[in-house]
Amino acid sequence: MIDSSRRAAAKAARRGRPNALFLVAAAETLPSELSGIAGGVTVNFPWGSLLRGVLAQDMPILEGLGRLLGPNGRLEAMVSAVARDGLTLPGDSDLRAGYLAAGLDLSEYRQANAQEIAERPTSWARRLGAGRDRPVWRIVAVARAERQHPEGS
């Protein structure tokens, strides 16, 4: 198991960008040292609690993602949720209000086009049938410059 982890890390290191940080942690409990360090956060086809957070239906998660961003940093998400997922897509005003409460200005919330979906060729998107069997929504938000990152959050 350790050997396969080393091989996976080596492959990622060869492909990764030198300024990329990879972390396995819950979005709502990210270390405070990460507050404000990111110019951008990308979330591709989340499910479960991360999907609820991106849809502003689990605010601690959305707030955690927002805390990662420096002033004017961008959160970009591609999401797909249908009734059988047990989630309802929020209306524009509800999503906007949730993002504002998390210190983010919602700049885009619309159905993604085929090219945007193709630019995110994840295995999970293929399994979902994203864009083919299920609609995909693009969400883009920008961190408000006047936000403060409280100590320990």
Regions found by a protein language model. Give the residues of each.
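Class I SAM-dependent methyltransferase SAM/SAH-binding core
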Residues: 1-30
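Short, well-ordered coil/turn elements that cap or connect secondary structure elements
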Residues: 15-17, 70, 101
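A short acidic, Gly/Pro-enriched loop at the edge of an enzyme's catalytic core
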Residues: 24-45
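Short "lid" loop at the C-terminus of a central beta-strand within the Rossmann-like core
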Residues: 29, 47-48, 80-85
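A short SAM/SAH-binding and catalytic strip from SAM-dependent methyltransferases
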Residues: 38-58
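A short glycine-rich, Lys/Arg-flanked "PGG" loop and its adjoining helix->strand segment in the class I
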Residues: 55-74
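Acidic carboxylate diad motif detector
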Residues: 73, 77-81
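Class I S-adenosyl-L-methionine
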Residues: 85-153
